[in-house]
Curated annotation (Swiss-Prot):
Keywords: Activator, Coiled coil, Nucleus, Transcription, Transcription regulation. Residues 86-125 form a coiled coil. Component of the Mediator complex. Residues 317-343 have a biased composition (Acidic residues). Residues 271-316 have a biased composition (Low complexity). Residues 247-343 are annotated as: Disordered. It comes from Dictyostelium discoideum. The lineage of its organism: Eukaryota, Amoebozoa, Evosea, Eumycetozoa, Dictyostelia. Component of the Mediator complex, a coactivator involved in the regulated transcription of nearly all RNA polymerase II-dependent genes. Mediator functions as a bridge to convey information from gene-specific regulatory proteins to the basal RNA polymerase II transcription machinery. Mediator is recruited to promoters by direct interactions with regulatory proteins and serves as a scaffold for the assembly of a functional preinitiation complex with RNA polymerase II and the general transcription factors. This is Putative mediator of RNA polymerase II transcription subunit 4.
C-alpha cells in the first residue's frame, strides 16, 4: 500500500485513478461472491483470489469467515488509496484551472504587445517620412514649406528693422504728454519763491515723504483699544466694566471688634438688583469714552485725508506794472463818480 501511495509522482494522475477504481471494483466483487458462497455453499474462483493477493496461507475454493474479514480489510485499504488519489486529483484540477487562466492572460498580453508593435511601426514610418521631408526642405532653402525652416530663420535673423519702424511710427498725442508732465511736475520742480524752512504749497510735494508726513501718517498713530482687542493685541478688555468697585463685602465691621453685622437676604437681593441696573449705565459710559478716544485719535488721520485747500499763487514777475494799472483804473472810476455828482 505504501509503495502504491508513493508511486503517485512522475506519472499522469489519470492512470493511478483508473488503477484504484479497478482494484476497488475487483475486491468488492470478490467480497460479494464470498458472501454468496457462505450463504449457498458454492465454490469460489481461485484465479480471482490470486489476483487480489490476499495474505492467506491456503487458498480454498470454499469461503470462510476469516477470508471474508481479510477481504473487508483489503477493501478498506483500497478505499483509502482511492480517497487519497481523489484529493490529489482535486488539487490537480485547481492548479490546472490557474494554469489555464494564466495562459489566457498571456494570450491577451501577446495580442496587446502585437498591436502596440504595429502602432510603433506605423509611428516610426510616419516620423521617418516627416524627417525626410523636412531635410529636403532645409536643403532646398524653402522656408515656407516647413515649420523647422521658419523657426531657424527667426532665430538666425531677428527682424529688428520692423520693430524699430513700429516704434518710430507710433503716435503719441500732446494731451498724453501734457497730462503726464502735470502728474510729475509736483515732484520735479520747486514752486516760485521756495524757501527750505517754509511748508510747501498744496500743488507741490516732495519726491519722497518727509519726517512730518511720516509722523502724521497712520503708521505712527496708536489705534483705539477696541481695535487692539479685535486683533488680540490688548491684554485687558477696556470695554467691560470693572465689578470690583461695585462688589461690597458681606461683613461690615463697626467701632468694636465684636460688633459684626451680617446683611439679610432681602438686602443682598436689593444690592444685586442695584448692581444689575448700574452695569448697563457703566457700559454705555465706557463705550462713549472709548468712542471719544477713537475720534480724538483719528483726528490727525482725518486731517491728512482731507484734501488741501487750493491756494492762489501769484506768479506775476512785474507787480509794479499791475499796481500802476490798477491805480489808473481807480482814478478813472473816481472821475466818473465826480462827474455824476456834478450832474
Amino acid at each position: 500500500m505504501n509503495k502504491r501511495i508513493n508511486e503517485v509522482s512522475g506519472r499522469p494522475i489519470g492512470e493511478y485513478l483508473s488503477r484504484d477504481i479497478s482494484d476497488f471494483q475487483r475486491v468488492s466483487r470478490t467480497l460479494f461472491e464470498c458472501f454468496s458462497s457462505l450463504a449457498t455453499g458454492a465454490t469460489l474462483n481461485s484465479q480471482q483470489l490470486q489476483q487480489i493477493q490476499l495474505p492467506i496461507d491456503q487458498i480454498s475454493n470454499n469461503a470462510t469467515p476469516n477470508m471474508v474479514l481479510q477481504l473487508m480489510n483489503h477493501l478498506i485499504d483500497v478505499d483509502k488509496i482511492y480517497q487519497n488519489t481523489l484529493k490529489k486529483l482535486e488539487k490537480h484540477q485547481k492548479i490546472q484551472k490557474e494554469i489555464t487562466e494564466i495562459q489566457k492572460e498571456i494570450e491577451e498580453k501577446d495580442k496587446l504587445i502585437s498591436t502596440l508593435a504595429l502602432n510603433l511601426k506605423d509611428i516610426e514610418s510616419f516620423l521617418e517620412n516627416e524627417l525626410s521631408q523636412d531635410n529636403v526642405n532645409i536643403n532646398n532653402g524653402n522656408a515656407s514649406d516647413g515649420i523647422v525652416n521658419e523657426v531657424l530663420i527667426d532665430l538666425k535673423q531677428p527682424d529688428d528693422a520692423a520693430s524699430m519702424d513700429n516704434i518710430v511710427n507710433r503716435e503719441v498725442s500732446p494731451e498724453d504728454l501734457i497730462s503726464y508732465a502735470h502728474k510729475i511736475s509736483g515732484t520735479t520742480s520747486a514752486p516760485f519763491g521756495y524757501q527750505p524752512n517754509a511748508p510747501l504749497a498744496s500743488l507741490f510735494k516732495p519726491p519722497a515723504p518727509q519726517d512730518e508726513m511720516m509722523r502724521s501718517s497712520v503708521l505712527f498713530t496708536k489705534p483705539p483699544p477696541h481695535v487692539l482687542k479685535y486683533y488680540g493685541l490688548a491684554e485687558i478688555d477696556v470695554t467691560t466694566p470693572t465689578m470690583a468697585a461695585n462688589i461690597s463685602s458681606p461683613f461690615s465691621i463697626g467701632g468694636n471688634v465684636g460688633d459684626v453685622t451680617t446683611p439679610t437676604s432681602k438686602e443682598q437681593e436689593d444690592q444685586q438688583q442695584q448692581q444689575q441696573q448700574q452695569q448697563p449705565q457703566q457700559q454705555l459710559s465706557q463705550s462713549q469714552q472709548s468712542q471719544q478716544q477713537t475720534e480724538s485719535e483719528l483726528q490727525p488721520i482725518q486731517s491728512i485725508l482731507q484734501p488741501p485747500q487750493q491756494l492762489n499763487i501769484d506768479l506775476d514777475l512785474n507787480p509794479d506794472l499791475d499796481s500802476s494799472g490798477d491805480d489808473d483804473d481807480e482814478d478813472d472810476d473816481d472821475e466818473e463818480s465826480e462827474e455824476v455828482e456834478w450832474d
